[in-house]
């Protein structure tokens, strides 16, 4: 099979025009409509012949014998890599992204708002991973007593990001006890590089409990329970998604079985994380087209993703997931700008926290 750089100018121009038309219409493209919409310098017979050649080379395919042609994943890849002209986000889009970055009161709101905004701007699914615990472990805890047995836990990460969690205890703790428990746990967190892992923290507390027979023993027991409830569910990278159902509006997913398979793919969070974690070492936007993404067991899905972080520390990934027929020229700069603005917002939140 010929490589992409072996295509001549005529083949490239016709492929570019056809991909643009298919992205716009969602309908297989025939030679005559292609000529009427583009200022191509060749005859209809020449265009038909070139389209047949591009099909033989694996860049186009015919979904039906009597229809026009559509791009294959290989055709999309060549288009994105060598023919695509991205355009900067509009002023309105920039304003919406900047407003979210400036207005989010905390990290959770920022992550959820980003997924929703990516969906709203792209009309595809917006996906954001929460900051990875291994990249940004907890280094300080604070406990705020709301009621006798209801405690607000404030986590401060190594990068300075602040998150909160409500914990319901089966016993009461006085403010002074909470203060002592926080001081004790923070000492353990600072003493070991891996102490943010619950297992290591628990082992350190149990060691102290076995060695201590004084009144402090009761506090250590409470601190252990408090730590376990505080860290429960925090050591796992999570995925926030908005707009998965937008796929159902695309003609490519009008088949019920195909749509169901796609939605099952969205439900497999581990699969999504594997895809997005591939972006963590990248310096810029990454585009996975069709089978490249391994996002789902169905074809026609692409992922446009970028890492976000604070300073030189990469914390997570954000992405737009849509049909391979997505408007890459618009989506790629949207993802890029959003990642940069969210990174700035995280820096501001950590400094403010």
UniProtKB/Swiss-Prot annotation:
InterPro entries: GAF-like_dom_sf, HrcA, HrcA_C, WH-like_DNA-bd_sf, WH_DNA-bd_sf, WHTH_HrcA_DNA-bd, WHTH_transcript_rep_HrcA_IDD. GO terms for biological process: negative regulation of DNA-templated transcription. Signal peptide: none annotated. It comes from the Bacteria. GO terms for molecular function: DNA binding. Pfam families: HrcA, HrcA_DNA-bdg. SUPFAM superfamilies: GAF domain-like, Winged helix' DNA-binding domain. The keyword Lipid metabolism does not apply. Keywords: Repressor, Stress response, Transcription, Transcription regulation. The keyword Transcription regulation applies. Belongs to the HrcA family. Negative regulator of class I heat shock genes (grpE-dnaK-dnaJ and groELS operons). Prevents heat-shock induction of these operons. This is Heat-inducible transcription repressor HrcA.
């Amino acid at each position: 099979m010929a490589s992409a750089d072996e295509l001549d100018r005529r083949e490239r121009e016709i492929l570019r025009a056809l991909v643009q038309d298919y992205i716009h219409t969602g309908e297989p493209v025939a030679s005559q409509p292609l000529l009427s919409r583009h200022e191509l310098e060749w005859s209809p017979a020449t265009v038909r012949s070139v389209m047949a050649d591009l099909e033989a080379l694996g860049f186009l395919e015919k979904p039906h014998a009597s229809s026009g042609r559509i791009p294959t994943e290989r055709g999309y890849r060549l288009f994105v890599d060598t023919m695509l002209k991205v355009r900067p986000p509009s002023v309105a889009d920039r304003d919406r992204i900047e407003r979210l970055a400036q207005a989010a009161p905390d990290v959770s709101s920022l992550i959820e708002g980003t997924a929703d905004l990516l969906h709203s701007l792209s009309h595809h699914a917006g996906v954001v991973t929460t900051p990875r615990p291994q990249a940004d472990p907890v280094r300080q805890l604070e406990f705020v007593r709301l009621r006798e047995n209801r405690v607000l836990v404030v986590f401060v990460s190594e990068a300075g990001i602040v998150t909160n969690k409500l914990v319901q205890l089966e016993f009461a703790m006085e403010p002074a006890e909470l203060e002592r428990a926080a001081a004790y746990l923070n000492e353990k967190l600072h003493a070991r590089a891996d102490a943010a892992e619950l297992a290591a923290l628990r082992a350190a507390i149990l060691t102290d409990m076995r060695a201590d027979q004084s009144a402090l023993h009761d506090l250590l027991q409470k601190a252990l329970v408090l730590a376990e409830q505080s860290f429960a569910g925090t050591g796992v990278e999570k995925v926030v998604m908005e707009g998965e159902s937008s796929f159902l509006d695309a003609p490519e997913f009008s088949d019920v079985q195909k749509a169901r398979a796609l939605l099952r793919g969205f439900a497999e969070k581990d699969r999504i994380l594997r895809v997005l974690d591939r972006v963590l070492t990248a310096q810029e936007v990454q585009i996975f087209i069709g089978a490249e993404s391994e996002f789902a067991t169905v074809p026609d899905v692409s992922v446009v993703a970028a890492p976000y972080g604070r300073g030189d520390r990469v914390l997570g990934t954000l992405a737009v997931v849509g049909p391979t027929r997505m408007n890459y020229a618009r989506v790629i700069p949207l993802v890029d700008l959003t990642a940069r603005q969210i990174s700035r917002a995280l820096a501001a939140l950590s400094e403010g926290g």
